[in-house]
């Protein structure tokens, strides 16, 4: 008898198989007991008939509790009405562990109740579907960059300096010295790009922002890319290619999950390059034309981003922000030094910024000047300045927030569902 994953049952019609998993749900009509079993790859209905199975097996099936772990043996047969189109005529059942009364029933529960039991909430079909799409996005990112000759170069999580100032950093004690949890691997990406040409890193990022919104996490994952001899336009094109590739990949490989999430995939099929673009200055004019009192030099908030992105209905690049509201390393536009060669990619449907990036300053003296303007200590960035002393070249990069991308693709209302164990302003457990 072969051990089979539920997702592969269609290949075993008429054969006897062994399924190992957990009881998701059950129902009984008196003479027949239906066991809905999950194994992480799908759901299958096990049918236990009292007359055929015998009194002992039927009684065991009737007494098993929700989320008990089990091993189920039986013959696979087609049944269009059953989950997945197949069911198992059960001939054997073994309880691995009889679960205690399960706290999460199939009825509706409040968000706080579920968040406190996130370690169990992820077992539900909806949450599992989201995590499967997340896995597909992570695999897709790696495939995309590897196919374009980018090298994976891991960046440190503990850093001695801040990438964009210390205001939103988690400070830790590093053997008596101040250190910080990384808010970006970008500075290190710039160093490895000078060695390897094209690089990317994939890891957790930490922001101590006092933000309690549906878009914000204290800990989230970013894929960050950096490439030597890449200018602003090269960078924009790479971002367009990446996002459209990932959307297309999920549409192709996660149809079942998107259907379970009831995602309107029609809103994703048109995500193809080139994406619309709007300069920061034009965006300010657009907002004012809609009756919003917005001054040039201010940074966009969530309502502004939503208004802009909904105007296009597609991901849109907002580019050439004022130099004073962007990071110290952003390269000023040679044609207008008041703005930088940077861009944010806004997702439609109110999901906000999913990518931030731009061309970096490659001139030593200008970078020093920018450090002073941002009140950052030059001595802490000597290693970073070295990159402009020894073979400096034009280079560009960006960071993509995995959870925001996932939330948009899945149509998730709150970003807490886009990561297995969210860390939010007032929640650190489980």
From Swiss-Prot:
Q: Does the keyword rRNA processing apply?
A: no
Q: Which domain of life is it from?
A: Bacteria
Catalytic activity reads:
tRNA(Asn) + L-asparagine + ATP = L-asparaginyl-tRNA(Asn) + AMP + diphosphate + H(+)
User: Where does this chain mainly localize?
Assistant: cytoplasm
Q: Which keywords appear in this protein's UniProt record, sorted alphabetically?
A: Aminoacyl-tRNA synthetase, ATP-binding, Cytoplasm, Ligase, Nucleotide-binding, Protein biosynthesis
Cite a single GO BP annotation: asparaginyl-tRNA aminoacylation
Where does the sequence pass through the membrane?
A: none
Mind listing the GO molecular function terms for this protein? asparagine-tRNA ligase activity; ATP binding; catalytic activity, acting on a protein; nucleic acid binding; transferase activity
The yes or no answer to whether the keyword ATP-binding is present is yes
Gene Ontology CC annotation, any one: cytoplasm
**Catalytic activity, EC:** 6.1.1.22
Fetch the Pfam families from UniProt: tRNA-synt_2 (PF00152), tRNA_anti-codon (PF01336)
> Known InterPro entries for this protein?
Aa-tRNA-synt_II, aa-tRNA-synth_II, aa-tRNA-synth_II/BPL/LPL, Asn-tRNA-ligase, Asp/Asn-tRNA-synth_IIb, NA-bd_OB-fold, NA-bd_OB_tRNA
* Subcellular location as annotated: Cytoplasm
Q: How does it assemble?
A: Homodimer.
Provide the family line. Answer: Belongs to the class-II aminoacyl-tRNA synthetase family.
- In Swiss-Prot or TrEMBL terms, this protein is called Asparagine--tRNA ligase
Its organism's taxonomic lineage begins at:
Bacteria, Bacillati, Bacillota, Clostridia, Eubacteriales
